[in-house]
């Protein structure tokens, strides 16, 4: 980089090289990989047994009869898989290379992650007895994201660990709350309900 940009390269230079198709017959290549992210450490919160032993109002309706780890309910292993496929070659004086990249990235919070597809086409045409080269580069990206609700993590650390995630079908409130258990308190929402039912998404393409 310094040989190209001189002193202007002192702060760092990113060089991007666009690949072109190789001469000869068509060549197809593929590579891919899978990764997983997990939460290393979490905040220690009161579990159902501790809640029952420490809460002085446990016999006055605070015990909802379940044992729920709310942090486990709203988190998951963040599984990501990436696939890259390319096709290159030449026909006469025209060389070509088409490449596609697909990424499906899952977040550690439920309903969080994105799916992205990238495509690129490079064409190179020789003309005038190889004295002139005409290059054409086309690229496109399509991405759909689910941003999730980080507030679900806050409620997961506050919510009653003896409350169930969902109500029995026979419960009269099951239809009211969409099947989820919900305490009628201000700013005290079922973490799984807001993570699963909330719509927080976006998309873009170029």
Predicted regions, residues:
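Glycine-rich, phosphate-binding/catalytic loops in enzymes
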Residues: 10-14, 47-48, 115-116
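Outer-membrane beta-barrel transmembrane strands
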Residues: 76-94, 101-104, 117, 191-206
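A beta-strand signature from Gram-negative outer-membrane beta-barrel systems
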Residues: 1-29, 80-82, 95, 101-106
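Surface-exposed loop/interface segments of Gram-negative outer-membrane beta-barrel transport/assembly proteins
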Residues: 22-67, 108-109, 118-205
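Residue-level signature of outer-membrane beta-barrel architecture
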Residues: 18-20, 89-91, 102, 121, ...
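Conserved short hydrophobic patches within well-ordered secondary structure
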Residues: 12-16, 98, 119-121, 204-206
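C-terminal beta-signal and adjacent terminal beta-strands/loops
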Residues: 72-74
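Short, glycine-/polar-rich solvent-exposed loops and beta-turns at beta-strand/coil boundaries
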Residues: 6-10, 76, 112-115, 150
């Amino acid at each position: 980089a310094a040989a190209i940009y001189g002193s202007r390269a002192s702060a760092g230079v990113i060089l991007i090289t666009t690949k072109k198709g190789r001469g000869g017959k068509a060549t197809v290549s593929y590579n891919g990989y899978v990764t997983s992210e997990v939460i290393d450490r979490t905040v220690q919160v009161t579990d159902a047994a501790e809640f029952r032993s420490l809460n002085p109002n446990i016999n006055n309706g605070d015990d909802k009869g379940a044992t729920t780890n709310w942090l486990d309910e709203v988190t998951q292993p963040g599984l990501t898989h990436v696939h890259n496929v390319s096709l290159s070659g030449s026909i006469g004086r025209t060389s070509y290379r088409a490449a596609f990249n697909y990424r499906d990235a899952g977040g550690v919070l439920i309903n969080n992650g994105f799916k992205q597809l990238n495509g690129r086409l490079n064409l190179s045409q020789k003309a005038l007895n190889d004295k002139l080269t005409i290059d054409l580069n086309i690229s496109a990206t399509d991405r759909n994201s689910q941003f999730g609700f980080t507030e679900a993590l806050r409620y997961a650390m506050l919510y009653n660990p003896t409350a169930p995630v969902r109500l029995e079908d026979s419960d009269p409130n099951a239809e009211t709350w969409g099947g989820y258990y919900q305490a009628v308190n201000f700013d005290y929402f079922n973490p799984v309900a807001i993570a699963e039912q909330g719509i927080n998404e976006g998309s873009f393409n170029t």
